[in-house]
């Protein structure tokens, strides 16, 4: 059986690599003062937006005809309990502020893939409600096939 990324039954045989993708003629929802931009191109390099505008070209890009399609920024889920291994609740104490979700992020949870498919790119993972003061949260940027350490935001403030 081949190694997969993540190494579970629904992983990819080949580790996914970032690509340069050019979306042509999309309706772009900026969620900013610019509003909705019709027939607009979006160039994505190394997983980040590199350019937004008209008539963008890049010889190295895979071109996607996005006419009639809508693009928006990734959704941020500010209250999630997915991808947590046996650590959602620490019910034995009134306060579990000494523990952190960062220690129990499960990068192999299929719900990461489902979140990404639904447009959720970033989540705050929280403890459950078993005690008055829960443990510290973790903020993650979902990347299917990446390790937990690769998904955790670096130098984040640990919130309760």
Regions found by a protein language model. Give the residues of each.
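Divalent-metal coordination cores built from histidine and acidic residues
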Residues: 66-160
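Histidine-rich, glycine-flanked metal-binding segment
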Residues: 34-72
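Envelope-exposed proteins and targeting segments
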Residues: 19, 24, 38-40, 121, ...
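Short beta-turn/strand-loop junction motif enriched in small, turn-promoting residues
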Residues: 28-33, 125-128
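Short loop/turn motifs at secondary-structure junctions and domain boundaries
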Residues: 11-13, 31-35
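Extracellular/periplasmic ectodomains of large secreted or surface enzymes and adhesion receptors
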Residues: 1-25, 53-56, 67, 80
């Amino acid at each position: 059986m081949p190694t997969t990324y993540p190494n579970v039954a629904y992983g990819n045989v080949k580790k996914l690599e970032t690509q340069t993708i050019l979306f042509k003629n999309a309706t772009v929802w900026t969620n900013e003062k610019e509003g909705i931009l019709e027939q607009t191109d979006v160039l994505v390099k190394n997983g980040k937006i590199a350019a937004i505008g008209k008539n963008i070209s890049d010889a190295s890009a895979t071109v996607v005809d996005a006419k009639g399609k809508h693009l928006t920024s990734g959704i941020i889920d500010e209250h999630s309990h997915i991808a947590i291994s046996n650590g959602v609740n620490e019910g034995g104490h009134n306060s579990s502020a000494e523990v952190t979700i960062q220690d129990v992020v499960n990068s192999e949870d299929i719900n990461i893939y489902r979140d990404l498919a639904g447009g959720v790119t970033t989540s705050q993972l929280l403890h459950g409600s078993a005690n008055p003061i829960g443990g510290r949260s973790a903020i993650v940027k979902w990347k299917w096939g990446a390790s937990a350490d690769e998904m955790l935001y670096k130098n984040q403030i640990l919130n309760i």
